[in-house]
Amino acid sequence: MAGKKVLIVYAHQEPRSFNGSLKNVAVDELSRQGCTVTVSDLYAMNFEPRATKKDITGALSNPEVFHYGVETHEAYKQRSLASDITDEQKKVQEADLVIFQFPLYWFSVPAILKGWMDRVLCQGFAFDIPGFYDSGLLQGKLALLSVTTGGTAEMYTKTGVNGDFRYFLWPLQHGTLHFCGFKVLAPQISFAPEIASEEERKGMVAAWSQRLQTIWKEEPIPCTAHWYFRQ
């Protein structure tokens, strides 16, 4: 939709990967719609995933005992966070939709993306106490996980060896994104592209492109435990 701003947080080492193809088609389709699309290519940026004292450029509020959450909250208020953090926060703040494109690592995100979440979504910027879930500081924004897996779709069912895929979405979609106030759109799951045929992979890319054509008309998922753990 013309005038909308989209941030794609991309976490894959190889530009020619299937994840890279999904990222590229998202950029192309959303740009075609007139959206302004920004990509944070975390590996290409050599993004620092570790949460350390270096994230605070000013004086610590308690130099005797370091508490990362407390210190980054204070640093956010004092405008003394490291520039790589504030650069990403500005991108998030300007975005109407944030898409996270990544391969599933151990039922979660790659370490570099976890580090992005740990460092960028700090108290004062993404949430406060009070000021979380429906009152999160990023309310009014949309978020979407676009994930590739190593396992097949059958493996991620209630009766499959891995269990229902929605179980693994709970800490990411609910405990992180919804906690920060995002309205979460249904995830885009591309199952087992490594073992899929070329035709099947093309179908996955086409399905993602087609979905993006009407992405602004989608309703967010219900932010309830039942959506994830329904019986």
Swiss-Prot record:
Q: Which residues carry this modification: Phosphoserine?
A: 80, 197
Q: Which InterPro entries match?
A: Flavodoxin_fold, Flavoprotein-like_sf, NAD(P)H_dehydrogenase_qn
The terms under GO molecular function for this entry are: dihydronicotinamide riboside quinone reductase activity; metal ion binding; NAD(P)H dehydrogenase (quinone) activity
Report whether Lipoprotein shows up as a keyword of the record: no
Q: What is its EC number?
A: 1.10.5.1
Question: Its principal location?
Answer: cytoplasm
A Pfam cross-reference name: Flavodoxin_2
* Residue numbers binding substrate: 127-129
Enzyme class, top EC level, equals oxidoreductase
Where is the protein situated, by its record's location annotation? Cytoplasm
UniProt remark on cofactor binding:
Binds 1 zinc ion per subunit.
One GO cellular component term noted in the UniProt record for this chain: cytosol
The record lists Zn(2+) as bound by 174, 178, 223
Q: Could you share any additional remarks the record makes about this protein?
A: Uses dihydronicotinamide riboside (NRH) rather than NAD(P)H as an electron donor.
- Oligomeric form and interacting partners: Homodimer.
- Show the PANTHER family listed in the entry: NAD P H OXIDOREDUCTASE-RELATED, RIBOSYLDIHYDRONICOTINAMIDE DEHYDROGENASE [QUINONE]
Primary role: The enzyme apparently serves as a quinone reductase in connection with conjugation reactions of hydroquinones involved in detoxification pathways as well as in biosynthetic processes such as the vitamin K-dependent gamma-carboxylation of glutamate residues in prothrombin synthesis.
* Protein name per its UniProtKB record: Ribosyldihydronicotinamide dehydrogenase [quinone]
- Organism equals Pongo abelii (Sumatran orangutan)
